[in-house]
């Protein structure tokens, strides 16, 4: 993993947006082939989610709560089966690099609202993710780690 000029963060537990239904994002990450996802709407978040390169590091959260650090490993796709479960429209397969239970939570309000946002290297969000990646390098990742709330 080389040093990136930016990382991304995603929250996917409100696939219909504010005021809509809420899903358990952890279940998406615990699929046999873990996924992250977004809805389909006319916004930059959705376009960038579908276009971002494989190998991109993504911090997954529900509001201010960290869930996992992932790496995108496949192109964007749609799945009726996944959409029936999670109500998102667009999906990407990911490799789980680490679960948040094995690292510190971010400070409140560190990550902005929005579905899929970039974190440039000059931001505090970037440094949080970068420090987590360094922690993984030093302490290793737990291959078949399971998550418990």
Cite the ranges covered by each PLM segment:
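GIY-YIG nuclease signature motif recognition
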Residues: 10, 70-71
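Hydrophobic beta-strand signal
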Residues: 36-37, 59, 67
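Short, flexible beta-strand-to-coil junctions
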Residues: 13-15, 61-65
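Compositionally biased, charged N-terminal/linker segments
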Residues: 1-50, 98-102, 123-125, 131, ...
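Aromatic- and Lys/Arg-enriched surface recognition patch
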Residues: 65, 71-134
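Short coil-to-beta transition motif at edge beta-strands of beta-rich domains
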Residues: 47-61
């Amino acid at each position: 993993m080389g040093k990136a000029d930016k990382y991304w963060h995603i929250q996917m537990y409100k696939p219909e947006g504010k005021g809509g239904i809420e899903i358990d994002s952890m279940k998406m990450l615990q699929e046999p082939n873990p996924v992250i996802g977004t809805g389909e709407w006319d916004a930059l978040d959705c376009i960038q989610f579908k276009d971002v390169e494989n190998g991109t590091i993504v911090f997954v959260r529900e509001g201010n709560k960290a869930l996992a650090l992932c790496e995108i490993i496949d192109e964007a796709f749609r799945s009726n089966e996944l959409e029936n479960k999670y109500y998102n429209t667009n999906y990407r397969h990911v490799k789980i690099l680490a679960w948040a239970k094995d690292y510190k939570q971010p400070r409140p309000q560190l990550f902005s609202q929005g579905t899929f946002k970039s974190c440039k290297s000059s931001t505090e969000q970037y440094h949080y993710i970068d420090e987590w990646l360094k922690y993984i390098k030093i302490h290793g990742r737990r291959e078949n780690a399971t998550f418990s709330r």
